[in-house]
């Protein structure tokens, strides 16, 4: 098992939102969280990715509390694509996808040949090769979503947390992503 949530509680402005939630995410399994708008799916992703911290309960990764990991070590295990990404608009696709390799670099270390191969693989996997030198701001919403997916894939993590990963994508790409 990779990730486990045990009896977590989370509140927004002292109003209980998630109460006593427990769930296990097993290795080599795809787990989908389905529910109506406002039911806490994105909040759970924020908790799993350490953006929010649960009021009570624990979230473990390989039997270790997620908060006990250093940021880079956590990022080597968990990649996240959020529902809304509004940053890096003035950077090109290849640079943004390359940010997925940052957890593996030391301060001021350059990308290796292996890193560039992984970046090229992530770009090809998400069908972005023809856009790799374009600025993110000049891409459609669906193309931008694929850039975020490529960046997460470039992290080469055992866990991918995807919040509405097919938003803005054409049906063709929705099917490919879900495969």
Regions found by a protein language model. Name each.
Residues 34-36:
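The feature captures the beta-strand-to-loop junction immediately N-terminal to the Walker
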Residues 160-164:
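Catalytic Walker B motif of ABC-type/P-loop ATPase nucleotide-binding domains
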Residues 109-110, 135-139, 143:
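Conserved ABC ATPase signature
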Residues 49:
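Helix-to-loop junction immediately C-terminal to a conserved catalytic motif
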């Amino acid at each position: 098992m990779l990730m486990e949530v045990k009896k977590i509680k989370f509140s927004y402005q002292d109003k209980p939102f998630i109460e006593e939630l427990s769930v296990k995410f097993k290795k080599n399994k795809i787990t989908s969280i389905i529910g109506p708008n406002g039911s806490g799916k994105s909040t759970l992703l924020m908790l799993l990715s350490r953006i929010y911290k649960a009021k009570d309960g624990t979230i473990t990764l390989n039997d270790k509390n997620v908060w006990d990991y250093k940021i880079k070590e956590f990022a080597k295990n968990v990649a996240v694509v959020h529902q809304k990404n509004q940053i890096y608009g003035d950077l090109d696709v290849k640079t943004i996808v390359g940010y997925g390799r940052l957890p593996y670099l030391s301060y001021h270390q350059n990308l290796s040949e292996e890193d560039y191969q992984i970046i090229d693989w992530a770009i090809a996997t998400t069908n972005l090769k023809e856009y790799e030198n374009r600025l993110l701001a000049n891409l459609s919403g669906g193309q931008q979503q694929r850039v975020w997916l490529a960046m997460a894939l470039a992290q080469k993590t055992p866990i991918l947390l995807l919040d509405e990963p097919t938003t803005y994508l054409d049906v063709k790409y929705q099917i490919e992503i879900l495969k």
